């Protein structure tokens, strides 16, 4: 059930076609979870600053049932900052990513939970 959310001040017109699909496939590979359970939400055109400037930046979160922790999070940060840099031209030092290890009983899907 990984869910990746990107809030960014990058304009919608600068988000390349296929970017969400690419994030989905890369996260599936990185987490080892099926792409069918991965949700990606990119929210462009946000009023944001980072380090006091409105240069391109992103505030992100990755929620997952398991697969969250020290070494894994460093790998995700490298992957996701790389994609945000390559595709949206956001410098990695202008990205924060918060990681959330979700309890399966606290994640609803398809009329039930993952527990």
From Swiss-Prot:
The keyword Secreted applies. Signal peptide: none annotated. Pfam families: MIF (PF01187). Expressed in a wide variety of organs including brain, spleen, liver, muscle and kidney. GO terms for molecular function: chemoattractant activity; cytokine activity; cytokine receptor binding; dopachrome isomerase activity; identical protein binding; phenylpyruvate tautomerase activity; protease binding; protein-containing complex binding. Substrate binds at residues 33, 65, 98. Belongs to the MIF family. Pro-inflammatory cytokine involved in the innate immune response to bacterial pathogens. The expression of MIF at sites of inflammation suggests a role as mediator in regulating the function of macrophages in host defense. Counteracts the anti-inflammatory activity of glucocorticoids. Has phenylpyruvate tautomerase and dopachrome tautomerase activity (in vitro), but the physiological substrate is not known. It is not clear whether the tautomerase activity has any physiological relevance, and whether it is important for cytokine activity. Homotrimer. Interacts with CXCR2 extracellular domain. Interacts with the CD74 extracellular domain, USO1, COPS5 and BNIPL. This is Macrophage migration inhibitory factor. It comes from Rattus norvegicus.
């Amino acid at each position: 059930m990984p869910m990746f959310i990107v809030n960014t001040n990058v304009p919608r017109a600068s988000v390349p076609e296929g970017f969400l699909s690419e994030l989905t496939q890369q996260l599936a590979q990185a987490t080892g979870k099926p792409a069918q359970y991965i949700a990606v939400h990119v929210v462009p055109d946000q009023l944001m600053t980072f380090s006091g400037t409105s240069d391109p930046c992103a505030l992100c979160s990755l929620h997952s049932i398991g697969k969250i922790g020290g070494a894994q999070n460093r790998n995700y940060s490298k992957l996701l900052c790389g994609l945000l840099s390559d595709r949206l031209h956001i410098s990695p030092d202008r990205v924060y990513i918060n990681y959330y290890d979700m309890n399966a009983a606290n994640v609803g899907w398809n009329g039930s939970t993952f527990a």
